[in-house]
Amino acid sequence: MMQLIKTEYSLNSGYPIVRRTLEDKKKRVEQPGFGPESCCAVVEYRLRGNIRYAFGNSRMQVSMPPGIYTHNWVRLHGEMAALVAAIDRIERYSTDDVIPITAAYIELRPCEANCMQALRNILPEDARVYYSFEHPAQVDEWKVRANELCRV
């Protein structure tokens, strides 16, 4: 069964996936339309024997086939955007039928109503999901810490 692990929100985290997410967030906050209060996530996967990371956030536009929606893109929660990026890369570069996703880090705990159910359907049973703040109880604390991280 998927493991849900609460962890410290720190660039000095003992988990590489947490450090990677927060480092990416800090760099990307300088881009237009991207603020510290955009929920970020990273999916860790194995491809050709190496650990790789796919970043996602709630402000990213994910491409969709034309003619389905008004726009040819949608915005998803951070973890779903990261999953789409990881799966896209895996499909392009892997010939295995096994989903090589090993872990995910999401700043906010996945919401039970939607994201947690999707993660349970998509991620392998032995995947680890790390998060730092409870949703919705700690959203205000997350906003303060995210702004501190990004020095906004």
Protein language model features and the residues they cover:
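Hydrophobic helix-cap positions at the C-terminus of alpha-helices
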Residues: A86-R89, I122
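Short, internal active-site loops enriched in acidic
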Residues: R48, E107-C111
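Glycine-rich short-loop/terminal segments
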Residues: M1-M80, D88-T95
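Active-site or metal-binding loop neighborhoods of secreted/extracellular toxin and effector enzymes
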Residues: T95-V98, A103-Y105, A113-V152
